[in-house]
From Swiss-Prot:
Compartments, record wording: Cell inner membrane
Record-linked InterPro entries: HB_polyprenyltransferase-like, Prenyltransferase, UbiA_prenyltransferase, UbiA_prenylTrfase_CS, UbiA_sf
Predominant subcellular localization, coarse grouping: membrane
Protein name in the entry: 4-hydroxybenzoate octaprenyltransferase
Membership in a protein family: Belongs to the UbiA prenyltransferase family.
């Protein structure tokens, strides 16, 4: 009897795992790099706003909120890209394409994730709550941009970085110039690294009529990315000067330069797999800059 109960429990667990696995993949739970690329800039902001380790509840709210909103963003992105994903090699096995998740359930999942995230934000101050409404608008409208403009990567940077002004608002009750400088740096960074991502799908996107910075920049893609990364680093220099950060921050920026240079080495021939590696490598850039900020604000 005990053995039968054990096997029944295992069978039930496997059943639910198989049922929930497509939803986990739809939310990109199996690909944490996207979450980390959102997390690092938000943590930059939290540590700078608090001039050190932020309040534990604020840190928990923003960290959990980042995971929830990133997952929701992936869900709504796949929902709006149903016309495109079946024709792109990298995305043709996504749950909404294969039918393992229905469009209706995807919308329900998006709404649930955003409601939970909003519930967390309601524990913050009024300014943070108001800013979160703008963040919701950005998250919902981003997926449609690739149909109408070659600059969805720029808009992604605007959406991805919205946690920065929210973090300052939550801790300081205002959004100072320092926050907007950091926000601009993140827009430049996101545009640059998401162009690597767009270069992976460039040929398929051209066939389907989708738009991206990779298509817009064409043969000048590496040059423009170099300019974007340079502007990002210069803006981060302004952040360091305005916040009067110590030498550890500047060491982290020098390290970031080396890491970014490595991306151009591995993706210099524009091969899709190499471009994807360059995109993934930006996690180390974000983490390095965070380490510099965290050490520089330690008292």
């Amino acid at each position: 009897m005990a053995y039968e109960r054990f096997t029944s429990a295992i069978t039930l667990l496997l059943h639910w795992r198989n049922r929930l696995d497509p939803y986990w993949k739809l939310a990109r739970g199996d690909r944490p790099v996207g979450f980390l690329l959102l997390l690092w800039p938000t943590w930059w902001a939290l540590w700078l706003a608090a001039d050190g380790v932020p309040p534990w509840w604020t840190l928990c709210v923003f960290t959990t909120g980042i995971w929830l909103t990133r997952s929701a963003g992936c869900v709504i992105n796949d929902y709006t890209d149903r016309w495109l994903d079946p024709h792109v090699e990298r995305t043709c096995t996504r749950p909404l394409v294969t039918g393992t998740v229905s469009p209706r359930n995807a919308l329900l999942m998006f709404g649930t994730l955003m409601l939970i995230a909003f519930g967390l934000v309601l524990t913050m101050n009024r300014l943070t709550v108001l800013l979160s409404v703008a963040g919701l608008f950005l998250a919902m409208t981003y997926p449609y941009l690739k149909r109408y403009t070659h600059l969805p990567q720029v808009y992604l940077g605007i959406a991805f970085g919205w946690g920065i002004p929210m973090a300052f608002a939550a801790i300081q009750g205002k959004v100072p110039t320092l926050a907007w400088l950091l926000y601009v740096a993140n827009i430049l960074w996101t545009t640059a690294y998401d162009t690597w991502y767009a270069m992976v799908d460039r040929d398929d996107d051209i066939k389907m009529g989708a738009k991206s910075t990779a298509i817009l920049f064409a043969d000048l893609d590496l040059v423009v990315q170099g300019v974007l990364y340079t502007l990002m680093l210069l803006t981060l220099c302004l952040v360091g000067l305005r916040a009067t950060l110590s030498h550890t921050y500047w060491i982290s920026l020098i390290s970031a330069v080396a890491l970014i240079g490595y991306q151009f080495i591995i993706a210099r021939r524009r091969e899709p797999t190499a471009c994807f590696r360059a995109f993934m490598h930006n996690n180390w850039v974000g983490m390095t800059i965070f380490a510099g900020i965290a050490l520089a604000t330690t008292h």
